[in-house]
A protein has these predicted regions:
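Signature of the chorismate-utilizing enzyme
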Residues: 1-187
């Protein structure tokens, strides 16, 4: 694992502005710039492997290759996850980031288009330590992509304008009120 110190910014949105349009961009924000209590922010994008599940239907995408099959989602994720330990003082170097939905382990009928599980396997990350006021770029191997990230992190203007305009769409419920009440009552 490689680790390079990069320029520290109190507001990690600076890095997010450059990365947000990348595939599967993730920003685990400690909200330190608002609360003063969070310590670490973690940013990454472009995972080398993406796994989404809908019940036992598994979709695996690695670069331009993809496959779909039925299996136990956790067994498949374990096959791709590298459990080797890395000696580092950082909370994350590379690995899996994603979500496990509430219905991921329930045998319910799929009633929406949102996956039960969506995880990416990332081989690089920007780690911002607000306590030490340091930022680090960690990565497996130096590629052209990583070289561009290093350049952006160290040679960027700190007066970047943050995009505060967002487009919202109408909220659409994926279940009826009666079905919702029935499900909550069951719990």
């Amino acid at each position: 694992m490689n680790k390079i110190k990069i320029k520290y910014y109190k507001n990690s949105c600076f890095y997010g502005e450059f990365l947000k349009s990348n595939d599967w961009f993730v920003f685990l924000d400690s909200c330190n710039d608002i609360s003063g209590f969070g310590r670490y922010d973690i940013l990454s994008s472009s995972p080398h492997t993406k796994i989404t599940t809908f019940g036992n239907l598994i979709n695996v995408r690695q670069g331009d290759n993809s496959s779909s099959f039925y299996d136990n989602p956790l067994d498949v994720i374990k096959k791709y996850f590298n459990f080797s330990s890395i000696n580092s003082d950082l909370p994350f170097n590379n690995g899996m980031i994603g979500f496990f939905g509430y219905d991921a382990f329930e045998k319910k009928s799929q009633n929406n288009k949102f996956p039960d599980i969506a995880v990416g396997f990332y081989d690089w990350a920007i780690i911002v330590d607000h306590l030490k006021k340091e930022s680090w770029l960690t990565f497996e191997s130096k590629t052209d992509f990583i070289s561009r990230i290093i350049k952006l992190c160290n040679n960027s203007d700190s007066n970047v304008n943050y995009n505060t305009e967002y487009t919202f769409t109408n909220f659409k419920n994926n279940t009826s009120y009666d079905k919702y009440i029935d499900d909550v009552t069951t719990i």
